[in-house]
């Protein structure tokens, strides 16, 4: 009840600010958002969030005594928690720049455990000097890729083949004609890098925070006459552990782990047809909702001191959409695990010491055709999404962190999504 009252107060304040617009010509406030409902049925339980609305990959957990996959079970849901409310503010000139800000909420909350809580999606301010721009606050990660993302029915918006991350950041854009060149310092919030001892501390973002330096991202985008071409690179540093333990006792950990990532994309949009192609390649990009991670490369048995090595993963996607009022579209995605950069430490268990987002998945693919109807402020999309993943099975290879055999898990999802914009 208190959350609902807070929401009403927020809406009331926003509407009050809109009413004051005529009294202060230097400030304008616009309310926007949509009501979204979606119903789906799955054939295989998956790695997911938000009451299974945000589905990544089928999650293989083993077989029963009859040899059947335990997670190969049907489930369904109807939910409105992806509905959204936002406020855009345009303010006075400050430091010679046009100023604006955005604050946007949805009901995603703690997406896995309490997905109906009110939460911040975007909260940022912008200083625009025409040829340069400064963005401070939480918004899409630069690897989201501007306007070049797949058009699908699912809330995952193409993840884990498309980067999905909103984070606090300081981004500086250089605007040169049809080009935008950007540099950003990014910190983590909801979408995080993994660490080995997260359960012992209060915040899951500690791996990146304890790495001290922010993630550094550089990107460039060219946009003209329906053509968009972009590329980017990033580097981050994390601290996998706070402490290590060996035969001589428990000690403060000193080791860090650095990783890099790259992206490239192309989009062409005409009157009725849009095509988007995108690719990502990098190490330990779990904070971008990609599969992968890292593992222990060496360990000193006396002090417990460790070094680490990254898994390298890649993803590609192709999205095509035809039509305006009635639209037909399809998204195709494929990704793979190229293994670790260095050999993993063998502690005698038969498997390496690894963490991340399903680093045992060897490759994955998705096919998602859909049909959409757009009428004024209304949009209806019906989609079939098939996602399949090959999990490592059999003998573990310590030289690269991969497996000798594979076990395939496949989910068939049927979804209908309805949106009303305002």
Residue ranges and their predicted role:
Residues 80, 118, 165, 213-215, ...:
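Membrane-spanning beta-strands of outer-membrane beta-barrel proteins
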Residues 1-22:
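Bacterial Sec-dependent N-terminal signal peptides
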Residues 42-46, 112-114, 145-149, 190-195, ...:
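Outer-membrane beta-barrel proteins
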Residues 70-73, 108-110, 153-158, 195-206, ...:
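Extracellular loop and loop/strand-boundary signature of outer-membrane beta-barrel proteins
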């Amino acid at each position: 009840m208190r959350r609902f009252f807070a929401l009403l107060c927020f809406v009331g304040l926003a509407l009050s600010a809109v009413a004051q617009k005529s009294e202060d010509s230097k400030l304008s406030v616009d309310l926007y958002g949509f009501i979204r409902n979606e119903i789906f049925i799955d054939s295989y339980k998956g790695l997911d969030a938000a009451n299974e609305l945000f589905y990544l990959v089928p999650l293989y957990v083993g077989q029963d005594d009859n040899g059947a996959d335990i997670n190969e079970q049907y489930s369904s849901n109807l939910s409105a928690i992806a509905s959204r409310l936002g406020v855009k503010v345009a303010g006075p000139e400050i430091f010679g720049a046009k100023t604006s800000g955005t604050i946007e909420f949805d009901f995603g909350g703690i997406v896995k455990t309490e997905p109906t809580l009110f939460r911040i999606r975007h909260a940022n301010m912008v200083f625009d000097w025409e040829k340069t721009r400064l963005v401070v606050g939480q918004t899409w990660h630069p690897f989201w890729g501007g306007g070049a993302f797949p058009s699908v029915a699912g809330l995952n918006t193409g993840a884990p083949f498309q980067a999905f991350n909103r984070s606090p950041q300081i981004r500086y854009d250089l605007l040169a004609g049809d080009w935008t060149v950007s540099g950003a310092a990014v910190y983590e919030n909801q979408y995080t890098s993994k660490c080995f001892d997260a359960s012992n501390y209060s915040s899951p973002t500690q791996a990146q925070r304890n790495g001290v330096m922010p993630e550094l991202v550089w990107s460039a985008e060219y946009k003209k006459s329906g053509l968009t071409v972009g590329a980017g690179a990033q580097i981050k540093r994390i601290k996998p552990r706070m402490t290590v333990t060996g035969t001589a006792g428990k000690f403060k950990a000193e080791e860090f782990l650095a990783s890099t990532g790259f992206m490239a994309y192309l989009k062409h949009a005409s009157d009725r047809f849009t095509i988007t192609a995108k690719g990502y390649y990098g190490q330990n990009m779990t904070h971008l909702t990609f599969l992968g991670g890292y593992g222990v490369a060496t360990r000193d048995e006396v002090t417990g001191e460790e070094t680490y090595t990254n898994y390298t993963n890649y993803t590609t996607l192709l999205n095509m959409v035809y039509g305006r009022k009635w639209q037909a579209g399809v998204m195709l995605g494929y990704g793979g695990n190229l293994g670790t950069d260095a050999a993993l430490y063998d502690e005698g268990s038969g498997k390496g010491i690894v963490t991340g987002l399903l680093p045992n998945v060897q490759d994955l693919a998705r096919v998602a055709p859909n049909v959409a109807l757009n009428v004024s402020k209304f949009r209806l999309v019906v989609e079939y999404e098939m996602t399949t993943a090959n999990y490592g099975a059999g003998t573990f290879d310590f030289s690269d962190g991969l497996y000798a055999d594979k076990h395939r898990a496949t989910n068939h999802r049927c979804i209908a999504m309805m949106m009303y914009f305002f």
